Amino acid sequence: MPVIDFPRKDWALRPYQKELWDYLCAGGRHAECVWHRRAGKDEVALYHTACEMLETPANYWHMLPKGNQVRKAIWEAVNPRTGKRRVDEVFIPELFEKRDTDMLIKCKHNASTWQCIGSDNYEASIGSTPRGIVYSEWALANPSARGYLRPIIAENKGWQIFITTPRGKNHAYSTYQAAVKNPN
């Protein structure tokens, strides 16, 4: 059986991403990441999620503020450095299969799934059991999604990553300040 390098050998963390990556790889369960635009927030979160999918069979979500943003911003987004779709770079065909109609990725060697959804319609997730959620552009998301989904994450001993660009003093500012005060 061939050996598959994952994450890919040609993918490298930027220096400022290393602290977040190390925290997540050490089992960190709550990350607040407020970085500038084009800093690779989603990229780090996608690779972490893919690694988690391979290790722990479960459901994982990547959430943007609006459901109609997800296809453009994540599912069809092309990495300007490589010219490849981000989901194709991260979720390689040797390990994952893609279902375009509902933006779903399945792990080939266990039952893990990853799906893109919008926080504007989090109520539609009734009965779902995500173990990991990335809240992309958290400052623009519906903050009620976090409260609704937090008990599910806790029950599943899961994790949440809140990634965003600064957008003033709003719910993202509040959750970031709370994380600074309680880093554990």
PLM features: what roles do these ranges have?
Residues 1-184:
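Phosphate/NTP-binding elements of NTP-utilizing enzymes
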